[in-house]
């Protein structure tokens, strides 16, 4: 197992007046949590990762998990939850740990050293960003149906934005449309490199669409929640990043055809 060098916090650093915004040190308050995360990764996640890999060696479908893989992962997740190592990314105390972004960055740097650490502590993308969207602007019903199981680590999600024919990192270029017909939105479009849709546990999509083409360029877009099993949601196939398709989660080419929401 790879060993990582620990670089301790500098203790003799002195701030000049007015330099508070440039202080990028970890806070003293989060140090015990950070150390706990490191220990949990070493003692629980890394051994579990070996067992997880072995449990998947015999599977015939690369786009799935074996029951044994899910079992060992859930055991580690439940242990993390019991030890309070859960949902670090949300800044409020009710749904998250109440961490500042800087302190979370230190913890995230440790999570990134092990392929399954983030998921074990329910801090995997794109779920983290999707949960924050739901937590901040979701309705009570949306939070109960989608945010709650995401916070509990029971389901996975995807954020559906990138498109094949436009520079869609700029949302003003989005071409996928959602038109209001009666009391339903009808969605049509094509999406590229959608992370996580291949995961069989993915149950909800947050889809970036254009709903008001006549508005100012920055006000034409909306995000619509689309259940993964909605008729018209079609995965055309996996796409490759640095020669890898990252099965079973994947980065997918998708078509959205006459989806009614």
Segment roles from a protein language model:
Residues 166-170, 185:
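Hydrophobic, small-residue-rich alpha-helical packing segments that form membrane-like cores
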Residues 184, 188-235:
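A short core secondary-structure module
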Residues 173, 229-256:
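Flexible, small-/acidic-enriched active-site or ligand-binding loops
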């Amino acid at each position: 197992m790879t060993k990582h060098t620990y670089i301790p916090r500098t203790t003799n650093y002195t701030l000049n007046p007015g330099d508070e915004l440039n202080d990028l040190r970890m806070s003293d308050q989060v140090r015990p949590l950070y150390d706990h995360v490191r220990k949990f990764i070493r003692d629980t996640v890394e051994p579990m990762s070996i067992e997880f890999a072995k449990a998947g060696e015999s599977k015939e479908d690369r786009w799935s998990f074996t029951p044994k893989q899910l079992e060992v992962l859930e055991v580690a997740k439940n242990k993390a939850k019991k030890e309070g190592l859960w949902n670090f990314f949300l800044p409020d105390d009710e749904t998250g740990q109440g961490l500042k972004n800087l302190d979370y960055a230190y913890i995230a740097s440790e999570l990134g050293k092990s392929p399954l650490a983030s998921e074990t502590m329910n801090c995997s993308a794109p779920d983290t960003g999707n949960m924050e969207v739901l937590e901040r602007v979701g309705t009570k019903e949306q939070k109960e149906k989608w945010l709650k199981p995401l916070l509990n680590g029971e389901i996975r999600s995807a954020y559906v934005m990138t498109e094949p024919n436009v520079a869609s990192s700029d949302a003003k270029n989005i071409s996928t449309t959602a038109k209001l017909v009666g009391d339903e939105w009808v969605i049509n479009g094509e999406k590229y490199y959608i992370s996580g849709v291949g995961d069989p546990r993915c149950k909800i999509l947050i889809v970036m669409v254009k709903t008001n083409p006549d508005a100012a360029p920055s006000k034409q877009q909306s995000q619509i929640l689309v259940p993964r099993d909605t008729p018209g949601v079609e995965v055309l196939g996996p796409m490759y990043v640095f020669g890898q398709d990252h099965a079973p989660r994947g980065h997918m080419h998708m078509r959205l055809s006459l989806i009614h929401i």
